[in-house]
Amino acid sequence: MEHPKKPKLFLKTLIVLTCHLGGEGENSTLLLAQHGFSEGVLNKIPHICYRNCNTITSNKAINTYINLNNVSFDMSDYFSQIKLHKLPLTLMIPIEASRGCNWGRCKFCFLNKGYKFRTKSVKSVKNEILNYIEKFNCTSIFFLDNNIVANDNIRFDTLLDELINVRQKYNDFSIKTAEVTTKGLTFELIKKMSLANFESVQIGYESPSNTILKSIKKNNTFASNLFFIKWALQFGINLSGINILRNLLEEDDDGIKEGINNLFYMRFILSSKKFHHNISFLSVSTSSRYFKFLESNKLLDNWSSNTSSLLSEKIINKKDKYILFEDYTKKTYNKLWDIFKNVETYYIENEYKYKFIKNHNIITYREFLNNELINELEFKENEEHWCILTISNKKIVSINNLLSSIKNSNMKIIEQAICELEAEGLIYVNDTKTEILSIVDTDRILY
């Protein structure tokens, strides 16, 4: 359990409860269901806290983690009840291809406490899906994983191939939603996600500022997020839960201003009306890495919980509320976020488009705002500017990658070309020039 006092507090506060199970829960729940409150059994159940006469007892028995390859959801009763009562429901079956978090370093997150990271074999995932389809005639699934990629692109590639095979066998097969980490995802993998019929994906976005993402130790970068968004939308994959967390302790004016400036590189995406940010508030509790800092600096009074406010301090004292409830937020925020929202709204409400026209070895770039030409540039097919755009179209590259890929050039010329393309808003470049990507699709050329 994420906080040792939490189970006892639940039982102390809610007298109608008999016991509390923590951790992953399957083994504990099964043992409790099989043996109930039999004498001599409770002390063998992992992560249980229970009432013992007038005292509350916690058991520290070591939990054994189940092998995911041996586990699938028994949906028989669920589907039989739907059929019996003729319920008009849109049916989706949950699939667990992995459990826990393979990263575990994000400073703001406390959602995976008590979980051990491991994966289910690709073969088991495929067989489970096929079994559900054949048994229940349900071809819509969704993945429960925190990150279906699971930090293993080779495994993910194999999984996508198997999902594509399922799609070829059952034409109406669809993956309604899944969550991925964008770092390292290639154009080819995103394309395969479309072929497998991923309808919607969440990417763990958190911030439009690369500096803030780095400071909170996210695995994603702004470049990896932007690259995935660019191609996912072009392949018809919707994006959900593009959440920005306000009031991160690492947040400052410069980070928010960086996020505002980065909206310029998202203008075509925002203008498509297929993408927008959801601005929310950071939540903290005693499970959060931030809690000790807030407590030691006497800042907790600035954070409040809608849930805990419903309970009188006669029932639970103020300090214990931070243990029980995980929705403590700070309602005030940096007003630069209002500017961010206004700028984003501008890009959403105005139509940005572009086109490339090729004539011999000259490519003309034209950019339009509400159908009015606002920028026109010419590139020679073999010059540095066009080479940079094409090389960084379907992959994120570094300046050293560009230097080795562009013939008869040098670092000074490439640096100048990068600077000019960035100023025009045609490429995004991080501060170390290790992540460069084209925000336009250079394959969209009119001849």
Positions of PLM-derived features:
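Glycine-rich beta-alpha loop elements in corrinoid/cobalamin-binding modules
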Residues: 1-63, 422
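Hydrophobic, secondary-structure "cap" segments at the distal end of domains
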Residues: 323-397
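Long, charge-rich, low-complexity alpha-helical segments
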Residues: 379-447
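Residue at a beta-strand N-cap/secondary-structure junction
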Residues: 4, 119, 395-396
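A structural motif corresponding to the C-terminal lobe/cap of the Radical SAM core domain
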Residues: 17, 119, 166-171, 181-353
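N-terminal [4Fe-4S]-dependent radical SAM core
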Residues: 51-95, 364-365, 370-378, 421, ...
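Radical SAM [4Fe-4S] cluster-binding motif and immediate context
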Residues: 69, 73-236, 246-249
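Generic structural signal for hydrophobic
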Residues: 10-11, 132, 193, 232, ...
